[in-house]
């Protein structure tokens, strides 16, 4: 890492923002979490419905799906609610599909049974990394929803087969860095979002050069940073869920 690097936040190149996962944040949902990555704050809820989409009828398996949204003043300037505009943006659709894919990657859908877990991720304050924060928090909310089903005797075993978490990395002022905030994300040379399982498998890698192409060496460095950061996030998930020894 470049010792002369000066990140706007003062963090080291390989340093996460302060991350917090607060469980049972809302009253009604089977699982709910406030996830905080520095100044990025997202409420993630997991709601159980005893039905599945039409395309899964008679298949004997469950489903996880996600919706994502931002409050009008989650950013520096107010934006209209998508409901008021009458349609979702392409960005919103992309992010909520990503969240759903990430969670389904670590669920045994047959073990879930013919029911759906709806994940709702609502950004109340955005400072970069909202999609990766949403995935990391949504897993904890989904885990609590599964615990509710187990306690009610609706599941014979947990359908969760592994943890999943996500983080952003990028090349900022020529140096690979971990967990971009908005000040870095808006000025970085390369931006990458990485989703991984607790076992170290890759679920998704989204990488884009913002003008200057990145090298294979830089990509490897970014993936190494992401793997390290996600390892820390998975351990935090285990800690807040009381699974320290899992």
UniProtKB/Swiss-Prot annotation:
GO terms (BP aspect): rRNA catabolic process; rRNA processing; tRNA processing
Keywords: Nucleotidyltransferase, RNA-binding, rRNA processing, Transferase, tRNA processing, tRNA-binding
Chain residues that bind phosphate: 91, 129-131
Similarity comment: family membership: Belongs to the RNase PH family.
Catalysed reaction, written as an equation: tRNA(n+1) + phosphate = tRNA(n) + a ribonucleoside 5'-diphosphate
Protein name: Ribonuclease PH
Database matches in PROSITE patterns: RIBONUCLEASE_PH
Entry EC no(s): 2.7.7.56
Keyword hit for tRNA-binding: yes
Transferase is among the record's keywords: yes
Natural source organism: Burkholderia multivorans (strain ATCC 17616 / 249)
Function: Phosphorolytic 3'-5' exoribonuclease that plays an important role in tRNA 3'-end maturation. Removes nucleotide residues following the 3'-CCA terminus of tRNAs; can also add nucleotides to the ends of RNA molecules by using nucleoside diphosphates as substrates, but this may not be physiologically important. Probably plays a role in initiation of 16S rRNA degradation (leading to ribosome degradation) during starvation.
Enzyme class: transferase
Entry GO MF terms: 3'-5'-RNA exonuclease activity; tRNA binding; tRNA nucleotidyltransferase activity
Subunit structure of this chain's protein: Homohexameric ring arranged as a trimer of dimers.
A Pfam family reported for this protein in Swiss-Prot or TrEMBL: RNase_PH
Domain of life: Bacteria
């Amino acid at each position: 890492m470049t010792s002369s690097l000066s990140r706007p936040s003062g963090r080291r190149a390989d340093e996460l923002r302060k991350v917090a996962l607060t469980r049972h944040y809302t009253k009604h949902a089977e699982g709910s979490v406030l996830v905080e990555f520095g100044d990025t704050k997202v409420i993630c809820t997991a709601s159980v419905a005893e039905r599945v989409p039409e395309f899964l009828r008679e298949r004997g398996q469950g489903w996880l799906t996600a919706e994502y949204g931002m409050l009008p003043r989650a950013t520096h300037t107010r934006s209209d609610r998508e409901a008021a505009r009458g349609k979702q943006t392409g960005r919103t659709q992309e992010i909520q599909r990503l969240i759903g894919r990430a969670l389904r990657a670590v669920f045994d859908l047959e073990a879930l049974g013919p029911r759906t877990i709806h994940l709702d991720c609502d950004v109340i304050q955005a400072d970069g990394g909202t999609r990766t924060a949403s995935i990391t928090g949504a897993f904890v909310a989904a885990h609590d929803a599964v615990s509710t089903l187990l306690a009610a005797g609706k599941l014979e075993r947990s359908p969760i087969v592994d943890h999943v978490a996500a983080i952003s990395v990028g090349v900022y002022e020529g140096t690979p860095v971990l967990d971009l905030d908005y000040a870095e994300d808006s000025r970085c040379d390369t931006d990458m979002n990485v989703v991984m399982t607790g076992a170290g498998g890759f679920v998704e890698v989204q990488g884009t050069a913002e003008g200057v192409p990145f090298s294979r060496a830089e990509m490897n460095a970014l993936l190494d940073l992401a793997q390290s950061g996600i390892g820390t996030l998975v351990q935090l998930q285990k800690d807040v869920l009381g699974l320290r020894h899992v």
